[in-house]
Amino acid sequence: MSNCCRILWIAIVIGLGVLYYEITKEFPKPNIPLDTWWGTGKSQKIDTSMRPFKIAINDEVLNTLKVKLSDVSFTPPLEGIDFQYGFNTNTLKKLVDFWRTQYNWREREALLNKYPHFKTNIQGLDIHYVHIKPQVSKNIHVLPMIMVHGWPGSFVEFYKIIPMLTTPRTDYNFVFELILPSIPGYGFSQAAAKPGLGATQIAVIMHNLMDRIGFKKYYVQGGDWGSRIVSAMSTLFPENVLGHHSNLCFLNTLSSNIKSFVGSLFPEWFAGKQNVHKIYPLSEHFFTLLEESGYFHIQATKPDTVGVALRDSPAGLAAYILEKFSTGTNKAWRSAKDGNLQSKFTFTELLDNVMIYYVTGSITTSMRIYAESYSWDHLSLNMDRVPTIVPTACAKFPHEIAYKTDFQLAEKYKTLLQSTIMPRGGHFAALEEPLLLAEDIFSAVKKFIDHHSKKDSKNQENRDL
């Protein structure tokens, strides 16, 4: 081999090595200020008390809603089209009629007020949360856990799972004390007055909330945007987060995407026989993503424009939100005239969530999380490439919008203790399959406890040497 060839091969090897390093290198934990002021004007002294709060919507708001629901015109759907073009207006008419004539907000309001609600000011924003303290005997351990919702959800998604997580069981010696916040700009939580409040900055607010309540160490759980927020909490505050459970474990790195491409050569080996269809063929999943992500592009670029229409029209708001509850639960439901919405949910349950957006006028501010979290400033934090050492568990529901193998997730989550392939369910797990989700949370937290116990024992042994 000539010297030129040797030099060329050496250059190629070095180049590939540098490329591999750049693609796979881990980033340091970013320095996110803990006291950024997100309220109006300049930072000022705040009331740090935790104020009891009760949902009590003005009659005028409800009367206006009824008037608007009585004056809706519907464009007929195309022949042979179900939910493929979005929310079928024949189904929407039935929903609006139910909303106007049968849905009773005052009854639902009383149900929502069943658990104690509070507000407290964090970094200039009044943050709303529900706080559930279980009543148990002394031999049952009570573990604090924050559960964070996403879009287009709200804290009401968790109401079914509350008793499952707070009631003592014979197979575990612990239950959970739950903190269910509304993300800033959602529902009864105040929206930021300044740009820049992305998922990572919200994670700081949620950590400060837990600290304000009195929890120095706690567990986290989330799906959708909640999954991104609690993942960031685990990454930024490993000394405080005891365990991280998510029903949407996801990362979007160049190296993980390359693995998906290379894995297409050996799909069953890469994904496992039962999970191949969740990733491959790549082209099919790409076009599905393209078809279903139109809302994402709007909300990541011009959320305030579409927000004007959605805030003004309750029927439009319901269609926009509940179309996601159909497709997000099972994308095959696009081929059903009613979107199969009532096969897993009731109209009442679905409208409870829509009402949180309507009565608070928060649809515009809720959508801004997309623009803030996909800004260049936020993306430059490279949170997906900052390692998370906190014990982690992933519940993988079969109809979730995205799927990553444990091999890919291990890039970020260095202590992945549990990964469960669920038998059924989709994106809105807490509302759709609360029992499955609760079982997985209990199982995961038991593993987290055992992990910390072994770690503490090992540290003690090292100290004794």
Swiss-Prot record:
GO terms for molecular function: cis-stilbene-oxide hydrolase activity. InterPro entries: AB_hydrolase_fold, Epox_hydrolase-like, Epoxide_hydro_N, Epoxide_hydrolase. It is found in: Microsome membrane; Endoplasmic reticulum membrane. It catalyses: cis-stilbene oxide + H2O = (1R,2R)-hydrobenzoin; 1-(4-methoxyphenyl)-N-methyl-N-[(3-methyloxetan-3-yl)methyl]methanamine + H2O = 2-{[(4-methoxybenzyl)(methyl)amino]methyl}-2-methylpropane-1,3-diol. Its main location: membrane. It is a single-pass membrane protein. Belongs to the peptidase S33 family. Catalyzes juvenile hormone hydrolysis. This is Juvenile hormone epoxide hydrolase 2. It comes from Ctenocephalides felis.
